[in-house]
Amino acid sequence: MTLEEQQAKEALDGIIKKSRVHLYKPIQIAEILYHDRCIKQLDFLNLDTYRNQSKRWRDEICRRFLGRISTSSAKFQDNLFEKNAIPPEKLAVLGTLNRQSDGGVESYIYKQFFNRFSQMSERLAYVGNTDRYSFQLSEFLNLFWLEPGLKRSIDKIYEIVVYALFDALVSELGITVSIDFPKENLFLWEEYQDFAEKIITMPKNEHLKLPAKIHRVGVTNAADRGLDMWSNFGLAIQVKHLSLDEELAEDIVSSISADRIVIVCKKAEQSVIVSLLTQIGWKSRIQNIVTEDDLISWYEKALRGQYPIAEALLENIKTEIMREFPAVNEANEFLDFAQNRGYDITVTHF
């Protein structure tokens, strides 16, 4: 490889490494290269001729294999083509390499996609192959911490772990939520009853009791700043994993938006994170800080304690992983797709 080609490959590898398991941006690059090679040769240096089209090409693949598309802001999606990512000049070099290798760069990208979801399938198998006696939260978390391809998604795993325990506990406790209104406002209800009853099915005694529910929004992207969990009893929480090996302050400012934020971190980093949160003025927005040790202790109680809630807990984890990473299933058509395009997904270079 020439120096120019090596730099283009390093830029692509950087995008792949930074991507979460869904690999939206690498898939967009692969589809640009595919359309250039097989459908119509592109003018790579003229970004406006393929910038928006390439999002549609990417979305078509993502809907097929992921069941969703990127919901990140247009600005976040477009920074794929900035100088510190894959600018048109480097994309042109990749395009030449891709044509010369008969789709080798495309194969390389989709190999990474296949690897990520193969790794995720193995992690899901851990949940399926363990029970309340053998499941260890520390082992489960390390399956992601120790795998570079999945480490970028560790915040989603923490979110799932927190939600699974919270939801199982609310369900097992049998918590209910009551809705009513003062009798002196009965005249107002009667005035708008035909409309209101279509929204809230209120019984004649003006009192409604519902089972408490926790809902996880899920399926978020790296640039999303929204809610993680909400309930029908007023609770709205964002779970945010923080680590000192990242650009912590920037990560906090760009990611926190909910009124109640639960920070998840390593025990050894807790005091430093609290200090930094205080310095940048975010301490008041933090409802609590949960350490990994806390979660492990709570899971031990939930799985093997005096009053276990293991069945609901483990089922929640499995369900939410399948929901967050829907390509983790035995029926996906990815291998047929790769074969039809002539990809060699055993390729380790191009």
Swiss-Prot record:
Keyword Nucleotide-binding: no
GO biological process: DNA restriction-modification system
Molecular function as annotated in GO: type II site-specific deoxyribonuclease activity
Keywords (A to Z) from UniProt: Endonuclease, Hydrolase, Nuclease, Restriction system
EC number(s) from the headed UniProt entry: 3.1.21.4
Keyword Nuclease on entry: yes
Catalytic activity: Endonucleolytic cleavage of DNA to give specific double-stranded fragments with terminal 5'-phosphates
Domain of life assignment: Bacteria
Chain's role: A P subtype restriction enzyme that recognizes the double-stranded sequence 5'-RGCGCY-3'; the cleavage site is unknown.
Protein name from the UniProt record: Type II restriction enzyme NgoBI
Organism: Neisseria gonorrhoeae
